[in-house]
């Protein structure tokens, strides 16, 4: 998917990018490739692949109608090189984006990238989701939490749901169907008061299958969740 294909596909979906937005995606690509020589950000560095498998894939929840261009508070857990939240922010500038990542080098990259892109209302924090999930400044503060290829739903639920307001939504982007994962995550979702409201499949323009699972938070998360760093992965609920 060339940049021109990317712009044209978005236009067909009703999103006509400004010259500034096109420039932001171009700068994003160039910075990603440059920084990738210093720290391991992605195995995908060829321009057409980045536009398809990183940029287009990241904004799919918007294209599929699951996110509006409103000043909602969005948290991205384990965003790595900024996916999916920063491409979303470029497309929908009204989003207020917070990223938590466990690797400080990635946070350094994202901080400089946001400056290069001229993004406002973006915040970056270095640390573990389990620790921030017990911090009152973060817990129960977000309208949406996104996670792209971070963990299985059984683990991901505990890492993300505590951050949501009641009625807030987890948007999980996956490359494989989540049916089996959701079966395994039933107990975790029950304990965390999360309800699956959408399990959506779609295709990238090249025909590759992708999946979006949306979980709504129904009640306050019990205080004991999330457990200490590492435990959700070692002993899933």
From Swiss-Prot:
Q: What name does the UniProt record give this protein? A: Ribosomal RNA small subunit methyltransferase G
UniProt xrefs under InterPro entries? rRNA_ssu_MeTfrase_G, SAM-dependent_MTases_sf
Q: One Pfam family from the UniProt entry?
A: GidB
The answer to whether keyword rRNA processing applies is yes
Organism per entry: Streptococcus pyogenes serotype M1
Binding-site residues, S-adenosyl-L-methionine? 78, 83, 129-130, 148
Protein's job = Specifically methylates the N7 position of a guanine in 16S rRNA.
Q: Name the SUPFAM superfamilies on file.
A: S-adenosyl-L-methionine-dependent methyltransferases
Show the GO MF annotations: rRNA (guanine-N7-)-methyltransferase activity
Which EC number applies? Answer: 2.1.1.-
Enzyme's top EC category: transferase
CDD domains registered for this protein in UniProt: AdoMet_MTases
> Which key words are in the record?
Cytoplasm, Methyltransferase, rRNA processing, S-adenosyl-L-methionine, Transferase
What family does the Swiss-Prot or TrEMBL record give for this protein? Belongs to the methyltransferase superfamily. RNA methyltransferase RsmG family.
Q: Which domain of life is it from?
A: Bacteria
Gene Ontology cellular component terms for the protein in this record: cytosol
Its lineage opens with:
Bacteria, Bacillati, Bacillota, Bacilli, Lactobacillales
Main subcellular localisation:
cytoplasm
Q: ATP-binding as a keyword?
A: no
| Cell location | Cytoplasm
Gene label: rsmG
